[in-house]
Structures are given as structure tokens and as C-alpha cells.
Amino acid sequence: MNAGAVVVIGGTGGLGREIAKHYLDRGREVVLSGRDLARAAAVATELGGKSRGIALDLTRPHEIGAALAGIGPVDHLVLSGIDRGANTVDDYDVVQGVSLATQKLVGYVEVVHALRPRLSDTSSILVFGGQARLRPYPGSTMVSTVNGGVIGMVRTLSVELAPVRVNSIHPGIVGDSPFWADKPAQVLEAFRSGTLTGALATMADVVGATTFLLENPSVNGVDLAVDGGWR
């Protein structure tokens, strides 16, 4: 029996929402977070089941502990909340850069710190990175840097928190995600032609990989790409 909740940080949209839905459909208790309480509560109501929405802003790490205070035992923790956006060196936006680094590095670790007493020896953590760490593009310096930092985070957390398992997932282009689905067909085709499978990853593919990393008791300290062999 699973005694604890599944906590999805960044669970109000996109992949985080799909992960929350997956576990709710299987009767699990799910706590999903978003920056706006009303939106998080509305998504939780829409998804139904044993779901609850909370407000949590990763860019305000000193407030994270209080935001998570009402959560009990945790079986699985998914850290998927992130902002996108180009930030070129020529027009570097320091505020945007600090915000992104705070979210994905300081904020993620503070969530783990706040929930540490509620993790059991069989709990697991999944950290979302991304393939910009290996496939940079103009304006991706900060995104590529923090996604690379996720690898170091997983390495250290898996040692420090053992036997709690910690893994990361690095999706490529997820063709049916809200971010990519409305992009021009020629753009998606260019990415598709660069994969060894000849297909873009789907949200279902990422959810399947997520459950594998969260639930397989022998998988730990792994950084998994889900990108169809993007080259």
C-alpha cells in the first residue's frame, strides 16, 4: 500500500498536469502546485479524485517551507515547474536570469529540504531538466546552464538522501505538449527529421518515463533523455 502522496511541483499545466492526472486516475492522492492558488485549486477540481492544489512560487524560496507545511507523508516528488524564454548575452536580462536560476536550482532544492522529513526510505524524487543542456541555441545560455545543473543536483541528492531515490528526466521536443502543439508544421517536421525514431516524443511518452523513474526501485541517480534519439 502507498501511504504517502504524489507531489507535483508545477502541476497546473503541460507535463506536470499530465503526471498528476496519471496518478489521480490510479486512485493516488496528489498535491499539485502552481504560482496562483485559484488556478491550482481549479485544476485540482477539474482533475478530480484525491487532488489538492496549493500555491507555491519557486522564485520565492524563503516561502516554500510554509507553502508545503500542510503536506503529509510523500511517496513521490516531481519537480517540473519552470519558465521558458530566450535570454541572449547581447541583451542579457539579469532579472530573468536570476529568476530562472532561483527556480530550477535554489527553489527545487528548497522543496526537497522542506519535504525531507516527510520522505520515507522508499520515496523517490524526479527532477525535470531538458535537452537544451546538450543542444544549445541562441538565447539558451541560462536554460542550458540550469538544465546542466540538474545533473549535478541529482548526483549529489541521490548520495545525500540515500536510500531515497533521485533521478532526472530530460525531454526533447514534446510534439503534443501545449508549448509545441501550435508551432508551424515545418518547424515540427524539422525537429522530427532530426530524431532516429522519425517521431517526436509525446506527453504520454514522458509520463511513461516518469512513472518508470519514480517507481522502479533499482533506478537511482539516472539522467534519462526522452527525445527519440534526437541528433
Short names for language-model regions:
Residues 12, 20:
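N-terminal Rossmann NAD(P)H-binding glycine-rich loop of SDR-like oxidoreductase domains
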Residues 26-42:
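Conserved glycine-rich Rossmann-like NAD(P)H-binding loop of the short-chain dehydrogenase/reductase
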Residues 46-62:
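Rossmann-fold cofactor-recognition segment
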Residues 78, 126-128, 166-169, 221:
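Hydrophobic structural elements of the Rossmann-like NAD(P)H-binding subdomain
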Residues 79-98, 180-183:
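Conserved mid-core segment of classical short-chain dehydrogenase/reductases
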Residues 90-91, 97-111, 121-162, 173-175:
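Catalytic loop of short-chain dehydrogenase/reductase
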Residues 171-194:
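A glycine/serine/threonine-rich, flexible loop-to-helix segment
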Residues 199-226:
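C-terminal substrate-recognition "lid" of short-chain dehydrogenase/reductases
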